[in-house]
């Protein structure tokens, strides 16, 4: 430490009391100062969230040589390589995903949850990699495509369809979720594939009216959705809201 300027001493001290890990990743010397850190919990997942592949490799190296920095240090307590894979998928770090798989992580852990996370958060590159490695796109009644539809990731939806997934599982759940979250491009694509706009007692148009999705409501009506079901539920909901957005919906119902 004496070789560092006084200003750096102060900077290091400030960071030692901060939950930001960035300074520790500057080089091996700064990394070694983690033993003086005030951080209370394991930092492995935080490192993965930041996408620090080099740091993860270095930590593994320290474990292999039984380095005192990591052995018995609660900062480096492991929650398991499979959970690390899930974290990497959630935050979209494809290089880390590949690294954990190469190190033995199970891509089928928790019924292909890694693939489902990648679909949910929209990481097509990771989705393709996991599929290439054998991930099952149809687990949990094709939940992967349902998640992608719910979050509006059209490219992933199309990719899974190309691989043969069934978008109509659970009574057109993928379609209904796409409507509920106002992803019109996904909705149109699923309808083109045969999704029923009247499924579950016209659930889609009722939700579209409830949330004030004008373009979605107009599209569903043009496709034959019935806004008069359940004692005019959609009409009554739109009329109660009486804002400009809902007035537009109310207007198209009676054209």
Curated annotation (Swiss-Prot):
Pfam families: Ank_2. ANK repeats lie at residues 79-109, 110-139, 141-169, 171-199, 201-229. Keywords: ANK repeat, Repeat. The keyword Repeat applies. This is Putative ankyrin repeat protein R880. It comes from Acanthamoeba polyphaga mimivirus (APMV). The lineage of its organism: Viruses, Varidnaviria, Bamfordvirae, Nucleocytoviricota, Megaviricetes.
């Amino acid at each position: 430490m004496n070789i560092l300027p006084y200003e750096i001493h102060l900077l290091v001290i400030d960071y030692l009391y901060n939950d930001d890990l960035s300074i520790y990743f500057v080089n091996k010397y700064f990394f070694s100062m983690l033993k003086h850190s005030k951080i209370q919990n394991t930092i492995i997942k935080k490192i993965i969230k930041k996408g620090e592949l080099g740091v993860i490799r270095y930590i593994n190296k320290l474990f292999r040589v039984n380095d005192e920095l990591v052995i018995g240090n609660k900062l480096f307590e492991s929650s398991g390589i499979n959970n690390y894979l899930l974290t990497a998928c959630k935050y979209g770090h494809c290089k880390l995903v590949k690294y954990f798989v190469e190190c033995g992580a199970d891509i089928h852990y928790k019924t292909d949850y890694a693939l489902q996370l990648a679909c949910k958060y929209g990481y097509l590159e990771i989705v393709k990699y996991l599929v290439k490695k054998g991930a099952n796109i149809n687990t949990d009644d094709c939940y992967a495509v349902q998640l992608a539809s719910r979050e509006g990731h059209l490219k992933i939806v199309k990719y899974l369809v190309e691989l043969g997934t069934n978008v109509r599982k659970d009574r057109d759940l993928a379609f209904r979720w796409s409507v509920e979250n106002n992803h019109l491009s996904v909705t149109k694509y699923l309808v083109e594939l045969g999704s029923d706009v009247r499924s579950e007692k016209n659930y889609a148009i009722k939700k579209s009216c409830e949330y004030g999705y004008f373009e979605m409501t107009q599209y569903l009506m043009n496709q034959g959705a019935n806004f008069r079901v359940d004692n005019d539920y959609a009409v009554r909901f739109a009329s109660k809201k009486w804002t400009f957005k809902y007035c537009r919906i109310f207007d198209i119902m009676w054209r």
